Structure formats: C-alpha cells, structure tokens
C-alpha cells in the first residue's frame, strides 16, 4: 500500500493538480496529460505539445480547442512537425489522442513528392476522429511546408484500410483516392458528401447514407 501511494504521488504533477484516472489517463482540472498513453504516436504527441501554451505537459480545456485542422503528409524529405502539419516517412502508428481536440473539424492524410508503396494508414483513423466533419485520405496537394511540391494527380498506396463510419461520428464529408479498402461500412444520416476515386473496394460493402447530397465513385 505504501508503495502504491508513492507511485500515485509521483503522478501528482503541476502543483498537485493532476490525478490518475482508473483507465490510466492523466487528467488535471479536465485537462489531458501529454504522455505516451494518451498520445501513443510520437508525432501526434508533438502536435499536442505545440498547443500546450504554459508547457505544463497537460492540455487544459482551452488548449484542447486550438487545433481545428490536422494535415499528415507522407514524404521522405524535411520530415517533422510544424504547426498543424506532420511530414513523415514512417506514417502514423495510431491516431489516438486526436479525439481530445474538441474543435478538430478536418483531417487530411496525403502524399507529397514520390509516394512510398509501403506507407500504411493507421487502422484507427476513423476510431478516434468522431468529432471530425471532413476526412480526406490519400490526396496529393500542395505541401504547405515545402513549396517545391505542387498539387498533382499522383496517388500513394494504403493497404488494408478499414473504413467504418456510423452515426456516432460527426463526419459529413469523406474523400478517398487510390485506397485499397479491406472493409467499408458507412451507415450515417450525417454524411452529405462521399467521393471514392480509383479505389479498390471489397466485394461486399455497406453504404447507407439517406441524406447524401454528393456521390462520386470514379
């Protein structure tokens, strides 16, 4: 018991305001600890750290509202995190943690320069983006960090991507390009725009979107 108390006290950071929840999440005054458990991917963790204004390793409720758009670019040059842009050669291992950004409305995952066939989108992309209204996957676009790369029709490959969207998500617009889909299940009254271009879809898939306004399958 004495050892347990010491371990808990060791987690009481920032003037004793942080507590350890039953699920291991570090929280302080409705804040979220910036750690490997809450943000498993180091690059997503860097994004969180950039919005930690007072550098206390905790995202408070106001800091959680600062990120509104996240861009992930697959590239082999000038990798790193800058602002709301992740430029990575290794992809994202997990999107866990982005659910804490309450005002995050748009996520784009794409490529710049020469695509890598080994690149793979984290399978939990849709699991942790329930608050996001616009999701774009595998789009080539002008790199906001490196101006040498311009918008083009190039596609990168993403294998075994599972797409599951239901009414628990806020997603209104989904755009896919050049994706090999292992599973697709879209059942949503909120979905208004669905664009699926040059994708390899599974033999069986479900799309039930009664309020859809725009559909593009080619």
Predicted features by range, described:
Residues 2-4, 22-162, 167-182, 190-192, ...:
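N-terminal capping/linker segments that flank leucine-rich repeat
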Residues 4-5, 11:
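Hydrophobic alpha-helical segments and their boundary regions
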Residues 9-10, 28:
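Intrinsically disordered, low-complexity repeat segments enriched in small/polar residues
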Residues 10-20:
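Bacterial N-terminal signal peptides
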Residues 203:
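Alpha-helical polar/charged "hotspots" used for coordination or helix-helix interfaces
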């Amino acid at each position: 018991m004495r050892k347990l108390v010491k371990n808990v006290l060791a987690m009481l950071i920032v003037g004793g305001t942080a507590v350890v929840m039953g699920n291991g999440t570090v929280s302080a005054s409705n804040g979220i600890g910036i750690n490997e458990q809450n943000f498993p991917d180091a690059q997503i963790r860097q994004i969180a750290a950039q919005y930690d204004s007072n550098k206390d390793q905790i995202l408070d409720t106001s800091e959680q509202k600062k990120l509104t758009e996240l861009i992930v670019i697959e590239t082999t040059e000038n990798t790193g995190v800058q602002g709301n842009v992740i430029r990575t050669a290794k992809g994202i291992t997990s999107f866990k943690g982005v659910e804490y950004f309450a005002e995050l409305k748009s996520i784009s995952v794409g490529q710049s320069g020469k695509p890598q066939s080994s690149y793979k989108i984290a399978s939990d992309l849709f699991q942790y983006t329930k608050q996001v209204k616009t999701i774009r996957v595998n789009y080539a676009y002008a790199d906001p960090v490196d101006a040498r790369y311009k918008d083009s029709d190039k596609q990168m490959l993403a294998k075994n991507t599972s797409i599951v969207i239901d009414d628990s998500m806020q997603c209104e617009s989904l755009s896919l390009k050049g994706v090999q889909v292992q599973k697709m299940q879209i059942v949503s009254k909120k979905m208004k725009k669905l664009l699926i271009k040059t994708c390899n879809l599974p033999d069986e898939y479900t799309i039930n979107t009664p309020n859809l306004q725009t559909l593009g399958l080619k």
